[in-house]
From Swiss-Prot:
High-level lineage: Bacteria, Pseudomonadati, Pseudomonadota, Gammaproteobacteria, Enterobacterales
E.C. numbers: 3.2.2.23, 4.2.99.18
Family: Belongs to the FPG family.
Protein name: Formamidopyrimidine-DNA glycosylase
KW ATP-binding (keyword) present: no
Gene name in the database record: mutM
Organism name: Salmonella newport (strain SL254)
Amino acid sequence: MPELPEVETSRRGIEPHLVGATILHAHIRNGRLRWPVSDEIYRLSDTPVLSVQRRAKYLLLELPDGWIIIHLGMSGSLRILSEALPAEKHDHVDLVMSNGKILRYTDPRRFGAWLWTKELEGHNVLAHLGPEPLSDEFNGEYLQQKCAKKKTAIKPWLMDNKLVVGVGNIYASESLFAAGIHPDRLASSLSTAECDLLAQVIKAVLLRSIEQGGTTLKDFLQSDGKPGYFAQELQVYGRKGEPCRVCGTPIVATKHAQRATFYCRHCQK
């Protein structure tokens, strides 16, 4: 599933081609996504795009009368096309722009979403979200406060959007490795120093992935059709049985609640 770096990479890639241009019309080939594509999107015509923003894993296209909320789901990606290339099986939505560009949404598993809202505030998919991990609000003090009485393992807690948004399976595994924290540790067992370090490395890992265009393991592509290159820098995720890049100990993989967890027994305590 695309996580924060992949969604932010998409935002940065499409923004220059959309902001200041006008949506001439939307071409919906298959509106049966996780939720049906909103009727308002079908009716778009001569509509300027004012901004392209992100909240958590949602892309937000600001229009004069409302917002398009896009979620990439498990396998979605957005590309900017310079010409109307023939659509393939999983190309479900096109926004045809006044500058000759086309924003094309591809989603093999159709778990993504294209929604419409007049106001962002209070929308059900955006309500109850925690802070952005790259914001000043997310820091060691905040993390320690939220972990202090939490009797659950730290890894699934990091992946809870009520704690912090956008840290999914890949980046939770990578951040815990960078901080030297075992993924099964109780959140309440983390010390002040460990919370400070973990907040710092989460920011560093996410920023590095954004620099590399995100992580492509299967379906994700950047807006120019290229893969994300952070996969080449993964320390533990997807490396079961391979030697730890730090100590040489084979990487361990376990599964909890259908989620794979990767870690080094020697480096993470």
